[in-house]
């Protein structure tokens, strides 16, 4: 079973790229972030024509998430229960007995901003909900754009970016709290090349110079850890014309 995550930074713009990628990489499930489209304009017919069921949750201009699956999607949940939020950030569903949660974590803007306070509140709510989800669904995968680097290996310039957004002690502590619930960073279960990133700024030729961050993650539960066979970052879509600034991350379960 292969599952993937991709922040597409506008599905309207990137739909042809998503369909091309799925044709070349027919994963069993794919979660998308920053679809940036309302539900009435979501291209579900094109996705279904490609052989995928889909659950989606969007809004105009910002945010938006979707879960695509070759198998039926059941027990769909949108956003974190009991956490008041008008941002479309979370889509969850059960696929072939695996609970799949796709999430677009808040950016946070800057450590001294109101948006950072919101990010901390959101992360705490996610932690409480994930604990409940793991109890109900031992086989669980949480994946998406976390907007958090796990440690300095995930940062192109760890000295220059120390304590900036995505790299703060507070954000990393919240990431560790998710791990402590009984999940594992699938990418780090394997030896990986140094300076491996999933996001590169559009500016200053960042992709060409490999000045990026690893902020797109796949967490697998204890019950799935032994079945993880590979986890890779597919940089090819970042080379497309008019690409997303993120690229897909793919995990293979045996």
Predicted regions and their residues:
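Active-site beta-strand/loop signature of hydrolases that rely on acidic residues for catalysis
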Residues: 6-7, 22-40, 100, 130-152, ...
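Structured beta-strand-rich core segments of catalytic domains in phosphoester-bond hydrolases
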Residues: 35-38, 42-110
């Amino acid at each position: 079973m292969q599952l993937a995550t991709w922040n597409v930074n506008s599905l309207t713009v990137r739909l042809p790229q998503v369909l091309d990628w799925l044709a070349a990489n027919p994963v069993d499930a794919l979660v998308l972030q920053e679809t940036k489209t309302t539900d009435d304009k979501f291209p579900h017919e094109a996705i279904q024509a490609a052989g995928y069921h889909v659950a989606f949750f969007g809004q105009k201009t910002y945010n938006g998430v979707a879960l695509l699956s070759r198998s039926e999607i059941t027990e769909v949940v949108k956003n974190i229960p009991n956490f008041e939020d008008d941002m479309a950030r979370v889509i969850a569903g059960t696929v072939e007995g695996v609970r799949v949660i796709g999430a677009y974590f808040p950016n946070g803007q800057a450590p001294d901003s109101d948006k950072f306070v919101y990010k901390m509140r959101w992360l705490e709510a996610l932690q409480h909900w994930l604990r409940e989800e793991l109890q109900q669904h031992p086989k669980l995968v949480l994946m998406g754009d976390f907007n958090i680097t796990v440690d300095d290996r995930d940062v192109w310039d760890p000295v220059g970016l120390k304590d900036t957004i995505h790299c703060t002690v507070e954000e990393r502590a919240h990431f560790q709290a998710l791990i402590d619930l009984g999940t594992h960073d699938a990418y780090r279960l394997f030896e990986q090349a140094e300076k491996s990133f999933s996001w590169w700024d559009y500016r200053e030729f960042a992709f060409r110079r490999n000045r990026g961050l690893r902020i797109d993650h796949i967490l697998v539960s204890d019950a799935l850890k032994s079945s993880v066979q590979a986890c890779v970052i597919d940089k090819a879509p970042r080379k497309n014309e008019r690409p997303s600034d993120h690229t897909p991350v793919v995990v293979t379960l045996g």
